[in-house]
Amino acid sequence: MWNIFKNKSGQSHKVKDKFQLDLDNIPKHIAIIMDGNGRWAKERKLPRSLGHKAGVETIRDIVKECNNIGVRYLTLYAFSTENWKRPKEEINALMELLVNYLRKEVAELHQNNVVVNTIGDVSKLPKACEDELMKAYNKTKNNTGLVLNLALNYGGRDEIIRAIKLMYKDIEKKGLDIENVNEDLLKNYLYTKGMPDPDLIIRPSGEQRISNFLLWQCAYSEFWYSNIKWPDFKKHHLHKAIKDYQNRNRRFGGV
């Protein structure tokens, strides 16, 4: 089955829809825990760095497909606050991959109307990474298509603590009544301010945990797990996850 439709930028797309997706019920926000790169490499007796490199190829394909089918926000868990515990050589390889990805891909992402955004404390990343992220954002910030959130040096608990500290400073400065502190106010201090919570969170590789990812935002997200490791995750796996999402009844605590 082929579907022809227009995205937010008015561009026409032709998509082979194996799972007969309902294009009127595409998740606005998909978040992915990109897991399994290291184990993928180990199974092939390759260095872990080559697993991460293979994972970058998957990013390219999934970003393109999400943009094609009308997803508005795609958040990729790229490097957590806990990932600093990994060997220094692996961390350096990941940072180099990030820089190379941005340098190679930003022009095409910009051409495809994608916004490149970051969530997390990027000030602790190497300067080359921080500089390339800023360049990518400045180049794409006025685009109107898919918003690609790269979660870097990100942790859900860290984000909530940061938000509370920022909110407390404003309460002191502006003299806000503590009784007016509510969910809507706190959301304004999260990295994802102004974005919808993720409708669908995908985790490949066989692991079934949240790993400190979008803890505040995932309260009513639908979760989809797969044994496929991230470097082997293809467009049809994305379609299957979305189809499963479309077959669920989201009640948000109701009946």
Curated annotation (Swiss-Prot):
Catalyzes the condensation of isopentenyl diphosphate (IPP) with allylic pyrophosphates generating different type of terpenoids. GO terms for cellular component: cytosol. PROSITE patterns: UPP_SYNTHASE. Its EC number is 2.5.1.-. InterPro entries: UPP_synth-like (IPR001441), UPP_synth-like_CS (IPR018520), UPP_synth-like_sf (IPR036424). Its cofactor is Mg(2+). GO terms for molecular function: ditrans,polycis-undecaprenyl-diphosphate synthase [(2E,6E)-farnesyl-diphosphate specific] activity; magnesium ion binding; manganese ion binding. Belongs to the UPP synthase family. The active site is at D35, N83 (proton acceptor). Homodimer. It holds the Pfam family Prenyltransf. Keywords: Magnesium, Metal-binding, Transferase. Signal peptide: none annotated. Mg(2+) binds at D35, E222. This is Isoprenyl transferase. Substrate binds at residues 36-40, 48, 52, 80-82, 84, 86, 203, 209-211. Binds 2 magnesium ions per subunit. It comes from the Bacteria. One of its GO terms (biological process) is polyprenol biosynthetic process.
